[in-house]
Regions:
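Bacterial Sec-dependent N-terminal signal peptides
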Residues: 1-24
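Conserved functional acidic sites
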Residues: 22-216
Length: 216
């Protein structure tokens, strides 16, 4: 089992801009076809920043951040991309240095359908929408990958001794293995306020995302 925790208020601030009186993020505010996102990384600043407290009227000052590297992410139409035919329900594609992620964006959320030629068995919720302070929502468990592996590689990956042990001596080699990966994600908009960066000050929501991955 793997658990990942993320705080995403930086991403939301840069995607939505300073446009909120009371902060509500809908599908018209997040990325669309033709958008370009610039993702700057600071590799030199000491880890003196804190995520602060939960609640309303919070203030985060990250104005001392400096750009060490810059990544450019393009949001394009799935039509005409390498894996277009594998994602008939996708209406948005993210090109991150050639890595293509396919999404379906609706008024209730942004759903990830797969990455490259890895098509998810079920779409995974990437962002719930609309986002408002106090939102708590759970997605899953979602079966992301459910496939069978066969061939000579399997014999190398699973030694005969392991097969004998797992089968109580009924078999001495594996000819097929099933791989299943499931994700459960908890979303919580637990803070709201202003965020200051070298680009300016923005009204933001802070989205906490906890993802638990199980594989068998």
């Amino acid at each position: 089992m793997m658990i990942k925790k993320q705080l995403l208020f930086l991403v939301l601030a840069l995607l939505t801009g300073n446009i909120f009186a009371q902060i509500t993020i809908t599908d018209t505010d997040v990325f669309s076809i033709g958008d370009i996102a610039y993702q700057a990384n600071d590799a030199n600043t000491p880890f003196s920043f804190t995520v602060g407290s939960t609640g309303l009227n919070q203030s985060w000052d990250f104005s001392s951040l400096q750009e060490s590297s810059l990544n450019t992410i393009f949001f394009i139409s799935p039509i005409g991309t390498n894996y277009e035919n594998q994602y008939p329900d996708a209406n948005l594609c993210m090109d991150d240095n050639g890595l293509l992620s396919y999404f379906n964006k609706t008024s209730t959320g942004v759903f990830l359908h797969g990455v490259g030629d890895t098509v998810f068995s079920s779409p995974a919720l990437f962002y719930p929408l609309p986002l408002t302070y106090g939102l708590n929502i759970s997605d899953g468990p979602i079966v992301v990958i459910d496939t069978a592996i066969t061939g000579p590689f399997l014999s190398l990956a699973i030694p005969a001794a392991t097969v004998v042990s797992l089968s109580n001596g009924l078999a001495n080699r594996a000819d097929t293995a099933r791989v299943q990966i499931t994700n459960t994600t908890e979303f919580s908009v637990d803070a709201s306020g202003t965020l200051t960066t070298p680009l300016g000050t923005f009204d933001v929501l802070r989205l906490k995302r906890v993802q638990t991955t199980n594989s068998v």
